[in-house]
Amino acid sequence: MHHIELYVSDLEASRRFWGWFLKELGYKEYQKWSSGISWKKDRFYLVIVQAKEPFLEPEYHRCRVGLNHLAFHAESKLQVDQMTEKLTAKGYRVLYRDRHPFAGGDGHYAVFCEDPDRIKVELVAPSC
């Protein structure tokens, strides 16, 4: 994949989430302008852009047609555990707590959370 561009309802809130989350995964800030920012790792980059007022409704919902979630590689199960703790400490919503860290199924060690627009984000440990 080359890049993903997400339109967001609150650029600053999304910048705080994605900037922190992606930095933890080794991404570096790549581009920045008044209505957007991107982070890059290797050859892939993720872009967030402030949606214009006429397009803020209806709010995003992952069960509608379109994107359901974004999944990222973790370096280890330990990184998944550490990120789970950090997400909680920062007040971000961790999903499927009752099944964590195997909410994706047996042998699928991951944490699921939501960004400020409720886009589901998954961080997956390597399989053994």
Swiss-Prot record:
Tell me the PROSITE patterns matching this sequence.
VOC
The record's InterPro entries line, in alphabetical order, gives: Fosfomycin_Res_Enzymes, Glyas_Bleomycin-R_OHBP_Dase, VOC
Residue span, VOC domain: 1-126
Q: Give the source's domain of life in one word.
A: Bacteria
**Pfam families for the chain:** Glyoxalase_4
The name this protein goes by in its record: Uncharacterized protein YqjT
Q: Which organism is it from?
A: Bacillus subtilis (strain 168)
